[in-house]
Amino acid sequence: MKNEINAVLENMTATTPEPEDYTGEDGLLYCGKCRKPKEAYFAPDKAAIFGRDRHPAECDCQKTAREEREAAEKRRRHLDTVEELKRRGFTDPAMRDWTFENDNGRNPQAGLARRYVEHWEDMRTDNIGCLFWGGVGTGKSYLAGCMANALMEKEIPVHMTNFALILNDLAASFEGRNEYISRLCRYPLLILDDFGMERGTDYGLEQVFNVIDSRYRSGKPLIVTTNLTLDDLRNPEDTAHSRIYDRLLSMCVPVRFTGDNFRQETAKRKMESMKKLITD
């Protein structure tokens, strides 16, 4: 047993020299590259404990190599975390490509979306959400996806979904409605895309209200995209819609999206590319 302990202590206090290393005038081993010591002397009282007068020290080369290894490991863990967040956070893999880097820069609200992300801690503390409203194809969903991607790159969990999927999940959920909604509300940011497109049954409207009301009570920000107009939201057709819209407008700052229909432009560009391929 004593021999085993001595062997462990020997490994702990020994330094393995490289061919270019050398012994300095102080008797310590030095790195042949950076000329810094790879050993240091124990204090006299410690030397008696370990049976040696010196222990390994980190030269500049070793320090640089260690820092590079640590940085690579930190980067790997970060990428793994972001990958898991995006796997859980997006309901459509295509949303991963909805990033500020891929944005064409033509949407006038892109600056607002970027600033929201930059000031996320303030937005979260003050519970400030956004309601992106406007015509079809004006980039509402895309910019919401950009915000989600940017926040997840900062390792902030975000969930982007829509009520069509939520209602289907609730109908098929084995964990129970309350637990499912609670899970949605645990995300620091929840994004509800294409609001107003879900079926308007009494059951559907009740579940929509339950989700939005639960999010309201959680005190966490909500971002909503919708093709409904602000007038539609402020003048609902009935009580069921009124209490839903009232909650939304109390949680989210309305942001209007105007301009060209980017989807039509994309479709036109694809058509022109296809024609060119066919005719060439």
Where do the PLM segments sit?
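A short, basic N-terminal segment
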Residues: 1-104, 267-280
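Pre-Walker A (pre-P-loop) alpha-helix and adjacent loop at the N terminus of AAA/AAA+ ATPase modules
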Residues: 88-91, 96-130
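Short glycine-rich substrate-engagement loop in P-loop NTPases that contacts/grips substrate
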Residues: 108-117, 148-189, 199-206
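Walker A/P-loop nucleotide-binding motif
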Residues: 124-144
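Residue-level preference for the first positions of well-ordered beta-strands
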Residues: 127-131, 158, 189, 221
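Walker B catalytic acidic pair
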Residues: 194-195
